[in-house]
Amino acid sequence: MQSCDILDLIGNTPLVRLRNENIIAKAEFLNPGGSIKDRIALSMIEAAEHDGTLRPGMKIVEPTSGNTGIGITLVGRAKGYEVTIVMPEGMSEERKNIIKVLGGNLVLTPDNESIAGAVKMAEQLVAETGGIMLQQFKNPNNVRAHYEYTAPELWRQAGDRIDAFVSGIGSGGTIQGVGTFLKKNNPEVTIVAVEPKNVSALLGHEPGLHQIQGIGDGFIPDILDVALVDVILEVTDEDAIGTTRELAASNSLLCGTSSGANVWAARQIAKEHPDWVIATVLPDRAERYFSTGLL
């Protein structure tokens, strides 16, 4: 009988080609915690253990819009740490429940303060109760997880040819890590950033509410080098949600709304470049959005 630890199942996700399209997508929703954020949770926690900033008995506190919180709770609890996740109250009930079921503590902040309010509260909790904050928006091990693992997997699975890479911007780690690797291997690759309509930080818009959870937090993350981005595409809530539903119906892919946003944007690039190999990621699962406007 062969068996492995749950953390050994993070990464090495399959690559899916959308039917009758020149778009390939890495199925990150198949990670054990249900999202691409499992990768950075493992990377950041193990780096903190290695450098001694995280030691047995310490607490982990992290501000997040949801998926990073799930990943950190999964990895942190598997390693025996107490985990407290701080998130805006408007995130889906499923995300909140998953964190609690995995054994994490949950602190909610006003939705109109966006992720910035969660960051402020997390900093306050660390100051008052101790522990460490992994700081996904600043942590280089976020980028490293994608540069050293996600990107090489994608490049190999794609047969060493990718003409464009499309990714939404949440913490910035995916587009920075994968984009940097792809530029190194193909200097002509086009890196496409996806942001919610009218609240794009890259375009200088003010923060605002939208329904594409996981991207569009209203600021440019410290770990993102904006010079890496070649194209910025804005997607409406309606297009993101509609594409997410269509992916389930036409490709049997049960993904979240940021996946719909990514695929919608990839299709805009495909219209202009039908001969290109266009890669993207499907960051998380549909089930954590059934209480929102996805159904």
Can you name each region flagged by the protein language model?
Residues M1-L295:
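PLP-dependent amino-acid enzyme catalytic core
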